[in-house]
């Protein structure tokens, strides 16, 4: 299937679940990116999960963001239980604006959900010639050594930096081993 055809299908699914046009596009782009880079665990395989969370009112399909400005370089976003793609997209765009204006841009986000590959957002900043860091917490998924019960989240972290010899360098990792 061609990328454009797949995007239309994903877009329609999110629209059916009451996301606005712009947010449906943001989600579709992020999911397709995960598939293109081979991170299928963060692509189409998660689509049903997002839809189920919307149906269960765990994701607000029409969030109203609240922004608190701490300084010319630091913002805090209450994403109003937004789907993570939309909150992360907004946050990285704001961080880029702040960094271009003041030299550093920090945006904290609360009340959002799973946002897919953090490297996807890092890449946006690196393409603007900025060094970028992105990290989040996650629910318990890892058991301590010798234990049976999960206590630690995977807590993804990614970073990226412009590189003179290639377009960009990014790393996207988590605290867990690949299974």
Predicted regions and their residues:
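N-terminal and secondary-structure boundary signal
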Residues: 15-18, 37-40
């Amino acid at each position: 299937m061609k990328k454009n055809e797949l995007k239309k299908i994903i877009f329609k699914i999110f629209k059916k679940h009451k996301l606005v046009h712009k947010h449906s596009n943001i989600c579709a782009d992020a999911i397709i990116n995960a598939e293109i880079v081979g991170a299928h665990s963060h692509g189409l395989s998660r689509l049903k999960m997002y839809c189920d969370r919307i149906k269960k009112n765990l994701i607000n399909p029409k969030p109203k963001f609240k922004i608190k400005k701490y300084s010319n370089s630091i913002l805090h976003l209450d994403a109003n239980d937004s789907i993570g793609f939309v909150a992360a997209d907004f946050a990285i765009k704001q961080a880029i604006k702040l960094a271009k204006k003041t030299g550093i841009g920090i945006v904290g986000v609360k009340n959002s959900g799973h946002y897919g590959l953090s490297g996807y957002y890092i890449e946006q900043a690196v393409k603007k010639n900025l060094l970028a860091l992105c990290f989040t917490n996650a629910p318990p998924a890892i058991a301590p050594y010798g234990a049976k019960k999960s206590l630690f989240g995977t807590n993804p972290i990614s970073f990226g930096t412009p590189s003179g010899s290639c377009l960009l360098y990014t790393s996207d990792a988590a605290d867990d081993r690949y299974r």
